[in-house]
């Protein structure tokens, strides 16, 4: 069984890095978006097992995306992959309902552990 994951980041390079890491873990059902607004539209159209999102993006930030997902009543795991590691910012995300976060640059092993924890599927 492969998880379906939504990857949201305004950097095409970072999306490729995240997707490559997911592929290395055996996750191949991946949908990508270049900002939170597009990510939210995709989220509304498709069921996802997890959402991986950057924080700082144009049009709609990852935090705004997270809040919109939670406001819709969804409990899908949302993992922020971000450079935002300052305590106040992390607390803001936790209060908004983030499942977890990874600080860029991240290791594939860290991503694997979080995916196993939240979506309960074995990843390589």
Model segments located where?
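Acidic, metal-coordinating helix/loop segments flanking the phosphotransfer/catalytic sites
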Residues: 32-50, 71
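Acidic catalytic/metal-coordinating carboxylates
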Residues: 35-38, 61-67
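Receiver (REC) domain active-site loop signature in two-component systems and cognate sites
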Residues: 57
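Alpha4 helix (beta4-alpha4-beta5 surface) of REC/receiver domains from two-component response regulators
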Residues: 64, 85-100
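Two-component/phosphorelay signaling modules centered on CheY-like receiver
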Residues: 12-31, 118
């Amino acid at each position: 069984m492969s998880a379906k994951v939504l990857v949201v980041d305004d950097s095409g390079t970072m999306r490729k890095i995240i997707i490559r890491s997911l592929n290395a873990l055996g996750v191949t059902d991946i949908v990508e978006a270049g900002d939170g607004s597009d990510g939210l539209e995709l989220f509304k159209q498709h069921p996802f097992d997890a959402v991986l999102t950057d924080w700082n993006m144009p049009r709609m930030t990852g935090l705004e995306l997270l809040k919109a997902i939670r406001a819709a009543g969804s409990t899908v795991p949302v993992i922020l992959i971000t450079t935002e590691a300052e305590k106040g910012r992390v607390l803001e995300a936790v209060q908004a309902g983030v499942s977890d976060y990874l600080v860029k640059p991240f290791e594939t092993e860290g991503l694997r552990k979080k995916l196993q924890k939240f979506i309960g599927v074995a990843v390589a």
